[in-house]
Amino acid sequence: MSYQQQQCKQPCQPPPVCPTPKCPEPCPPPKCPEPYLPPPCPPEHCPPPPCQDKCPPVQPYPPCQQKYPPKSK
């Protein structure tokens, strides 16, 4: 068994939970009669989970019976 297979024998870890993006502090509202609305936070994208980059999807090995059907007597 190669080192890569040994590494990937275990299933990949679930992707990490994305931290909630922190909005920058909005500027003080200008002295205007209109209500001031701060700009919405830009959406932050989760980085791809590192495990999926390295690890191919783990395929379970089929049981023996599927590969070698028992000989009928």
Swiss-Prot record:
Swiss-Prot/TrEMBL sequence repeat ranges: 21-29, 30-38, 39-47
Q: Name one GO biological process term.
A: keratinocyte differentiation
Tell whether Lipid biosynthesis is among the UniProt keywords: no
Entry-linked InterPro entries: SPRR2
Q: Which residues form a coiled coil?
A: none
Q: What induces it?
A: During squamous differentiation of epidermal keratinocytes.
Where is the protein found, in the record's own terms?
Cytoplasm
**Chain segments carrying region 3 X 9 AA approximate tandem repeats:** 21-47
Bias category Low complexity: which stretches? 1-11
Identify the main location: cytoplasm
Per the record, what is one GO cellular component? cytosol
Q: Where is this region: Disordered?
A: 1-20
Is Disulfide bond one of the keywords? no
Keywords linked to the UniProt accession: Cytoplasm, Keratinization, Repeat
Reported function:
Cross-linked envelope protein of keratinocytes. It is a keratinocyte protein that first appears in the cell cytosol, but ultimately becomes cross-linked to membrane proteins by transglutaminase. All that results in the formation of an insoluble envelope beneath the plasma membrane.
Q: Which family does it belong to?
A: Belongs to the cornifin (SPRR) family.
Q: What is this protein called?
A: Small proline-rich protein 2G
Q: Which organism is it from?
A: Homo sapiens
